[in-house]
């Protein structure tokens, strides 16, 4: 037994997540297969190369609408019958439409993987889309977005009311649509055209991770290999920064409270090499820096953080902090001092080395299980080539302190954009208004009483 444990602990038995069985079916559909540790389970991801950014502002929700339509049913039993069939196979599914793609996510027992894949193929190929299904899908999307998109909501969107700080800045810079597209105006013809031109085999990637059926490759060629291919659509050019934005703005979030959220946003620079890994390490470093300054040293924020997002063709890095209303000015001063120090001194070598080592170490445990591994492949498709995914740990190791400092210099060359989200009124302001209102009521009452005070009787009317 000791010998067996020793053999199984050798590195050769470790799962190499970078190496996969990848190939193209004759129709151009890309297949990525990986045998995982959990042999009784499979994680399936069907990635279709069409997302929200492939359409202009008026039709941006069109891929999302089609995603919902594909779950409305493949026969007269409708959506319920489709769900019952998947339940009978012991599976669960969902779908997500992002800016870059539409992905169908399925978890299922390994013993039923081919039957579940049959069902996935059926919803892509055989779903009947009609006016009734379209109306139902539109209603679902409206509910997801908070209800009917009327004139009031459209006006609020145009005033940047209710938007997160990063969305507000992206809109101000021209990287994001000022209002959401009107799903009610989308037609059956538009949906069918999208399905015909974008849901093509040569625009899809099928990822299966887990206890793989030994006949799976032959099955996929016989089934998914029959999906039609089309001439790929040309993807639209992403929005670029086209407008100026104010350096500082206060955004109203809610009516009453003393909690404030501070966001200091910077446009990410475009780097020559190892772009994502360098910026990833830089964001981790800044995350530690704001934690150290705002929480540990000054006690201003409980959970400061750093977040990276993309809008159009630009990346955005945001340093965030939860604050009390009276601490905003002090927090702004502390962060300004931090930026000035980084501009002058650069990154601390020892801190950078520690954060880099931690990031590399995290890669060894961050994708545990079939589902996490399938999601990793889904997110790293741009780093896939000829049966291998790029090794993120190796790429992180290659980032030098000099490269990170150069990226930091480019990031902080401008002042950035400060956005402060706070309620319309703080409690102290409310108490002041209440006191003012009570004082006004009291003054008006006193004035009214004095005007109507009864006159004293004169002495001439007294009896003798």
Report each predicted region and the residues it spans.
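C-terminal regions of mature proteins
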Residues: 205-210, 344-346, 350-464
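Buried hydrophobic packing residues in well-ordered domains
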Residues: 28, 46, 64, 86, ...
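Acidic/histidine-enriched segments that form metal/cofactor-coordinating
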Residues: 75, 82-194, 242, 351-374
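An aromatic/glycine/proline-enriched structural segment found at the starts
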Residues: 200, 205-260, 266-270, 442-447, ...
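A structural supersecondary motif
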Residues: 263-265, 283-323
């Amino acid at each position: 037994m000791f010998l067996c444990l020793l053999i199984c602990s050798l590195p050769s038995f470790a799962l190499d997540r970078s190496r996969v069985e990848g190939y193209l079916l004759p129709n151009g559909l890309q297949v990525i297969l990986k045998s995982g540790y959990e042999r009784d389970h499979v994680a399936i991801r069907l990635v279709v190369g069409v997302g929200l950014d492939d359409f202009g502002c008026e039709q941006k929700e069109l891929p999302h609408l089609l995603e919902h339509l594909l779950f409305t049913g493949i026969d007269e039993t409708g959506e319920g019958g489709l769900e019952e069939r998947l339940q009978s196979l012991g599976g669960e599914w969902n779908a997500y439409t992002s800016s870059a793609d539409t992905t169908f996510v399925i978890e299922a027992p390994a013993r039923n993987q081919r039957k579940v894949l049959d069902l996935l193929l059926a919803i892509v190929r055989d779903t009947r889309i009609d006016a009734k299904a379209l109306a139902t899908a539109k209603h679902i999307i409206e509910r997801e977005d908070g209800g009917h998109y009327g004139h009031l909501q459209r006006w609020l969107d145009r005033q940047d009311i209710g938007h997160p700080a990063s969305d507000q800045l992206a809109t101000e810079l021209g990287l994001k649509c000022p209002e959401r597209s009107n799903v009610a105006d989308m037609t059956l013809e538009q949906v069918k055209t999208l399905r015909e031109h974008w849901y093509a085999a040569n625009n899809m990637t099928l990822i299966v991770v887990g206890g793989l059926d030994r006949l799976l490759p032959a099955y996929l060629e016989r089934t998914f290999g029959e999906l039609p291919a089309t001439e790929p659509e040309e993807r639209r050019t992403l929005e670029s920064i086209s407008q100026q934005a104010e350096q500082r703005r206060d955004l109203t979030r809610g009516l009453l409270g003393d909690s404030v959220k501070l966001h200091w946003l910077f446009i990410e620079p475009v780097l020559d090499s190892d772009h994502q890994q360098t910026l990833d390490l830089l964001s981790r470093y800044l995350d530690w820096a704001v934690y150290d300054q705002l929480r540990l040293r000054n006690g201003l924020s409980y959970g400061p953080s750093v977040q990276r997002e993309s809008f159009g063709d630009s990346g955005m890095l945001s340093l965030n902090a939860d604050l009390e209303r009276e601490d905003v000015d002090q927090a702004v001063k502390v962060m300004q001092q931090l930026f000035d120090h980084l501009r002058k001194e650069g990154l601390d070598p020892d801190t950078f080395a520690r954060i880099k080592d931690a990031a590399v170490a995290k890669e060894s445990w961050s994708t545990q299980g079939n589902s996490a591994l399938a999601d990793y492949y889904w997110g790293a498709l741009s780093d896939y080539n000829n049966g291998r995914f790029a090794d993120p740990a190796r790429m992180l190791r290659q980032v030098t302190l000099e490269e990170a400092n150069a990226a930091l210099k480019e990031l902080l060359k401008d002042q950035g954009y400060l956005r402060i989200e706070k309620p319309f009124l703080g409690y102290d302001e409310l108490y002041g208004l209440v006191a003012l209102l009570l004082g006004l009521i009291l003054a008006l009452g006193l004035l009214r009483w004095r005007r109507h005070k009864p006159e004293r009787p004169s002495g001439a009317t007294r009896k003798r």
